[in-house]
């Protein structure tokens, strides 16, 4: 996935103000939704290319097509994309590559693969975005479609290839500012809006039988299970980093002790008129420790934060339904006692 956007010369992005909002055509949304739900039935990650154009500060997505699912390593995915876009151009369809999309499970899309892929896209196609579609949340009746772009700090960090704690502090990068969410709007043609209005009149009225359905059977369970897994991963990263700090502290202590001993020996040599030993002879015995990669821990922290927000939102809605149910039950019992 990381080499799918390498057909353009890489260039550095200096500003995150290239795109102010994303406007997505209704047909493109339907094609993305259809593809993501088809792949979710097989527990696979759906991915595809976004086509459109940039008008002022607006990125218009007018079409899309899925990436091929093939186990053949000899298949040239880049050539496949170029062939599809060339054929779309022949039928007068927008063929400019403006990003990519992928499905999301349990409402969490932040991952190392997403970061790497978007970096290659954004450094080769400046205006590119990644659109994430949450299949699970959308299946409950809430269309969840979000567009993201890497922040300049994240691009600079990934370009330098330095994921040490010092690099994160210098660039002020955290899980909350790895990606910047871009507002996305869905636009339909006037004829489509007229047809939807007519279809809305033909639909039966919702009697609200499922209004108070808590629906906690699978949603909360999946969110909690994923949250526990991410917390375990973050704990392992914390243990690994603590061991690194302990080794560094032990090495520094031994180095200071050796330097102090050398200083005392050099003082004796000086008093005897003998040449002193330079400190470099001691320092080079202690090789600097390689700092652990903190990008994985940062991404895991972002996943934990996302799961916690989803759980809090879901629980607040469920509590509201519980209070409403309690009030209705009390009113019903009071009416029956009369």
UniProtKB/Swiss-Prot annotation:
SMART domains: JAB_MPN (SM00232)
Pfam families membership: eIF3h_C, JAB
Intracellular or extracellular location(s): Cytoplasm
GO biological process, one term: translational initiation
Domain MPN: 22-154
Broad class of the protein's primary localization: cytoplasm
UniProt-listed PANTHER family: EUKARYOTIC TRANSLATION INITIATION FACTOR 3 -RELATED
Protein name: Eukaryotic translation initiation factor 3 subunit H
């Amino acid at each position: 996935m990381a080499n799918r956007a390498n057909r353009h010369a890489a260039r550095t992005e200096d500003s995150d103000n290239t795109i102010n909002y994303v406007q997505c055509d209704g047909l493109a949304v339907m094609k993305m939704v259809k593809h993501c739900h088809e792949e979710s039935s097989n527990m696979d990650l759906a991915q595809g290319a976004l086509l459109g154009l940039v008008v002022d500060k607006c990125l218009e997505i007018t079409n899309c097509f899925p990436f091929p699912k093939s186990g053949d390593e000899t298949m040239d995915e880049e050539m496949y994309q170029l062939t599809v876009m060339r054929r779309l151009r022949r039928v007068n369809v927008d063929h400019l590559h403006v990003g990519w999309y992928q499905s999301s499970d349990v409402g969490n899309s932040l991952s190392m693969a997403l970061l790497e892929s978007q970096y290659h896209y954004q450094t080769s196609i400046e205006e590119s975005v990644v659109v994430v579609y949450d299949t699970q949340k959308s299946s409950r009746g809430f269309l969840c479609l979000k567009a993201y772009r890497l922040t300049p700090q994240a691009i600079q960090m990934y370009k330098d290839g330095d994921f040490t704690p010092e690099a994160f502090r210098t660039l002020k990068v955290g899980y909350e500012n790895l990606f910047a969410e871009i507002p996305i709007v869905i636009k339909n043609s006037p004829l489509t809006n007229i047809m939807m209005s007519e279809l809305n009149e033909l639909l039966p009225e919702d009697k609200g039988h499922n209004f108070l359905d808590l629906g906690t059977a699978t949603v909360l369970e999946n969110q909690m299970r994923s949250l526990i897994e991410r917390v375990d991963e973050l704990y392992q990263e914390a243990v690994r980093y603590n061991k690194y700090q302990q080794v560094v502290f032990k090495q520094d202590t031994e180095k200071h002790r050796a330097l102090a001993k050398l200083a005392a020996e050099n003082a004796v040599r000086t008093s005897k008129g003998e040449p002193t030993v330079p400190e470099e002879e001691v320092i080079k015995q202690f090789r600097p420790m390689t700092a652990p990669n903190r990008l994985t821990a940062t991404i895991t922290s972002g996943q934990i934060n996302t799961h916690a927000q989803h759980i809090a939102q879901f629980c607040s809605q469920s509590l509201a339904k519980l209070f409403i149910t309690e009030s209705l039950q009390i009113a019903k019992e009071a009416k029956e006692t009369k």
